[in-house]
Amino acid sequence: MYIVTGGAGFIGSAMVWKLNEMGIEDIVVVDNLSTSEKWKNLVNRRYVDYVHRDTFMDMVLHGDLPWDVDAVVHMGACSATTERDADFLMENNLRYSRMLCELCMETGARFINASSAATYGDGSLGFSDDDATMLRLKPLNMYGYSKQLFDLWAYREGRLDGIASLKFFNVYGPNEYHKGDMRSVICKAYAQIGQEGVMRLFRSCHPDYADGGQMRDFIYVKDCVEVMWWLLQNPGVNGVFNVGTGKARTWNDLVTAVFRAMDREPVIEYIDMPEQLRGKYQSFTEATMDKLRDAGCPVRFTELEDGVTEYVRQYLAAADPFL
């Protein structure tokens, strides 16, 4: 049995899609649907059961899991970089993850954890996923810090020898529609361009970057789940790994690709960055991918323009935009 936490969320539901593509339906989806629209991510998917997060955690605490678990793909977390409730993040992103990791170590199940590129802070220490760099990182927000704390715990307790913790960079693609302000700029741009014919980006607050010239490592969600599938097939590959393309692109590049995919000429305006983001905004991210490549991962990452075009034309513009 495969357990996917956050299985109704963005990357989690994409992982359920990938498992289905590989002929696997013995899947338990763990999530907290509440009043969100996440349930729509599951309509096209095949799985044997859905369990609420709190019920699942009670099962874990009391050793009452009714399944023979092959792997836990742990994508369940609060992923809002603007979340300010530190206690909530500690409980949801740190303690929850540690419990699942210990469960898998005890039972021999594969454990794949979602870390984040937010752990890299302002990027002044670079974006290397080696252990020495990890020990020195200073995240800019509580979300990144909660992810950093799990990686540090796993390192300190010797757990990184038996798990894979993945630092996802800027992920975009289908099934992110429920995320509100945390949706990718591609998703937001498609709606804004369709309604107004223009896309607005934040002005740069960094002297080294022009407006819209701030750079991110944008990775297509289908590539993320290809990496996770490969890790499921290669349980001897363990540690903290970056999951990006290794090639940073500008916000202007990204938005221009959306306009092109919509067969429109780019019209971009720049607005002031909100005060609460200043000093906490990464002007540049680019994954160092040597570690994953050296481990033998064969996944070829989708070029930005190709990924954006597929996302826009095959999903955002479709009657059924879901995987």
Swiss-Prot record:
Pfam families: Epimerase. It catalyses: ADP-D-glycero-beta-D-manno-heptose = ADP-L-glycero-beta-D-manno-heptose. Its cofactor is NADP(+). Gene3D superfamilies: NAD(P)-binding Rossmann-like Domain, UDP-galactose 4-epimerase, domain 1. The active site is at Y143, K179. NADP(+) binds at residues 10-11, 31-32, 38, 53, 75-79, 92, 147, 171, 179. Substrate binds at N170, D181, K188, F202, R203, S204, C205, R216, Y281. Binds 1 NADP(+) per subunit. SUPFAM superfamilies: NAD(P)-binding Rossmann-fold domains. Pathway: Nucleotide-sugar biosynthesis; ADP-L-glycero-beta-D-manno-heptose biosynthesis; ADP-L-glycero-beta-D-manno-heptose from D-glycero-beta-D-manno-heptose 7-phosphate: step 4/4. Disulfide bonds: none annotated. Its EC number is 5.1.3.20. It is an enzyme of class 5 (isomerase). Keywords: Carbohydrate metabolism, Isomerase, NADP. It comes from the Bacteria. NCBIfam families: heptose_epim. Contains a large N-terminal NADP-binding domain, and a smaller C-terminal substrate-binding domain. Catalyzes the interconversion between ADP-D-glycero-beta-D-manno-heptose and ADP-L-glycero-beta-D-manno-heptose via an epimerization at carbon 6 of the heptose. Belongs to the NAD(P)-dependent epimerase/dehydratase family. HldD subfamily. Homopentamer. This is ADP-L-glycero-D-manno-heptose-6-epimerase. It comes from Nitratidesulfovibrio vulgaris (strain DP4) (Desulfovibrio vulgaris). The gene is hldD.
